[in-house]
């Protein structure tokens, strides 16, 4: 007869680097059951203090067990050198959690290698990582972003917890150790919320296939945790979870949601239904909503809710595509046909000039400038805020034409002056001849 254990999903949690191993230790201290813990590090000393089921020192050759020195390339190379050992430790897993603190050397560089191996071996691979605090520096933040991008390529689902959001959970006296401990607790709650759904039978049961349907190839995910007591406790805890400061964005439009309720035996179905309906309203209309309940009388009247929302990448890409399609499908606005005045057209006389007197703008130059303004406004109506090349060409031609007109007017004036001078000279000559003739005759 086949043992029922053969049909239980095998879940392994791999902590990579200092932050990942600390998170694993925290989960072990909290008594997380039903999973196998694996610690992977380049720091031999840190591994000595871990209670993980399997400890894998990948820095024996590259770093002599002294750590990666905050260099992700060292962490990546160390993991590559021990691929066979990593494969051996992950073998047989149905689901693998890879936890790490991004920004350092081993976690940033080795976590994508570990996740890639797990994914290649057919395990549902979930990354749960933290982003560094701002006070840890720009270099660490930049390395973290690069590591997160690499993890996203190889994980089915990636949950990123920004440490800076943890500051919103504490008061002004929150210590550094308390902040990092809070980060480990968030990682623990996320992993526990998922594993408990699979490993602990509940009133509303969820199996591994349900979890896979939501988290396989899901891309980025958001995770929120809430707890409450007293009246309306389930709805209150759910509101805390979906409005958690740990979420970098809202869960609106999620196409996949895992919803876990944990409480005592008095946990009511109606209040669970009300909370699940609230989550469904925030999600995509075709959301794949998987929710389950876990009965734990040790919680007393407390209710804990874990929400993991996935499918944002596809939903947002589809929304962006729809917006682009809507823009491209919209008919182009026809340009307004405006009557462009000719150079001989005149504008209506203005009643008052800037000097208080009447003024008529019947000068061709002013009329031509008005026409230019009409043409430029018409061009800009189709070209946005920036001046187009046609505007510049027109103004250049306009200046040339104005210059030619001015030169033509000057020459015309010169010729008129010359003709008047010639007439004066002729009159002088005529008068001179009248005077000179008699004297000559004399």
UniProtKB/Swiss-Prot annotation:
GO cellular component: a single term: cell division site
InterPro entries xref list: Cell_div_FtsZ (IPR000158), Cell_div_FtsZ_CS (IPR020805), FtsZ/CetZ (IPR045061), FtsZ_C (IPR024757), Tub_FtsZ_C (IPR008280), Tubulin/FtsZ-like_C (IPR037103), Tubulin/FtsZ_2-layer-sand-dom (IPR018316), Tubulin/FtsZ_GTPase_sf (IPR036525)
Comp. bias regions, Basic and acidic residues: 349-362, 390-431
GO molecular function (one): GTPase activity
GO BP, sorted A to Z: division septum assembly; FtsZ-dependent cytokinesis; protein polymerization
Coiled-coil region list: none
SMART domains named among the record's database cross-references: Tubulin, Tubulin_C
Residues the entry annotates as binding GTP: 18-22, 105-107, 136, 140, 184
Main location: cytoplasm
Disulphide connectivity of cysteines: none
Subcellular location: Cytoplasm
NCBIfam families: ftsZ
UniProt subunit comment: Homodimer. Polymerizes to form a dynamic ring structure in a strictly GTP-dependent manner. Interacts directly with several other division proteins.
Protein name: Cell division protein FtsZ
Biological source species: Corynebacterium glutamicum (strain ATCC 13032 / DSM 20300 / JCM 1318 / BCRC 11384 / CCUG 27702 / LMG 3730 / NBRC 12168 / NCIMB 10025 / NRRL B-2784 / 534)
């Amino acid at each position: 007869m086949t043992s029922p254990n053969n049909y239980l999903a095998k879940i392994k949690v791999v902590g990579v680097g200092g932050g990942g191993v600390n998170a694993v230790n925290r989960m072990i201290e909290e008594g997380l059951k039903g999973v196998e813990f694996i610690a992977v590090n380049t720091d031999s000393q840190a591994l000595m203090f871990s209670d993980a089921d399997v400890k894998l020192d990948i820095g024996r050759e590259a770093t002599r067990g002294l750590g990666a020195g905050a260099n992700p390339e060292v962490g990546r190379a160390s993991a590559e050198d021990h691929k066979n050992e990593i494969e051996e430790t992950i073998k047989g897993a149905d689901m693998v959690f890879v936890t790490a603190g991004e920004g350092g050397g081993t976690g940033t560089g080795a976590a994508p290698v570990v996740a890639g191996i797990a994914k290649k071996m057919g395990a549902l691979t979930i990354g749960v990582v933290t982003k560094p605090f701002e006070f840890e520096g720009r270099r660490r933040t930049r390395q973290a972003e690069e590591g997160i991008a690499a993890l996203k390529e190889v994980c089915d689902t990636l949950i990123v917890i920004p440490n800076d959001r943890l500051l919103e959970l504490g008061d002004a006296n929150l210590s550094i150790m308390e902040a990092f401990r809070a980060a480990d607790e968030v990682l623990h709650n996320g992993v526990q919320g998922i594993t408990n759904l699979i490993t602990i039978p509940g009133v509303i049961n969820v199996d591994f296939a349900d979890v896979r349907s939501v988290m396989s190839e899901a891309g980025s995910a958001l995770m929120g945790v809430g707890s409450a007591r007293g009246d309306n406790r389930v709805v209150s805890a759910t509101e805390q979870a979906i409005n958690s400061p740990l979420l970098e964005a809202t869960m609106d439009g999620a196409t996949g949601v895992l919803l876990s309720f944990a409480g005592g035996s008095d946990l009511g179905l109606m209040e669970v239904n009300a909370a699940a309906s609230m989550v469904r309203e925030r999600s995509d209309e075709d959301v794949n909503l998987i929710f389950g309940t876990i009965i734990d009388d040790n919680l007393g009247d407390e209710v804990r809710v874990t929400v993991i929302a996935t499918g944002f990448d596809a939903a947002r890409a589809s929304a962006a595509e729809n917006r682009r399609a809507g823009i491209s499908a919209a008919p182009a606005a026809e340009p307004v046909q405006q009557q462009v005045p000719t150079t001989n057209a005149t504008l209506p006389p203005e009643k008052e000039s800037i000097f208080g007197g009447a003024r008529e703008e019947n000068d061709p130059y002013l009329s031509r400038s008005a026409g230019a303004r009409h043409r430029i406004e018409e061009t800009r109506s189709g070209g946005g805020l920036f001046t187009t090349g046609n505007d510049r060409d027109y103004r250049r031609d306009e200046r040339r034409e104005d210059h030619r007109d001015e030169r033509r007017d000057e020459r015309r004036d010169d010729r008129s002056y010359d003709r008047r001078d010639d007439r004066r000279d002729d009159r002088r000559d005529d008068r001179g001849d009248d005077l000179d003739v008699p004297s000559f005759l004399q």
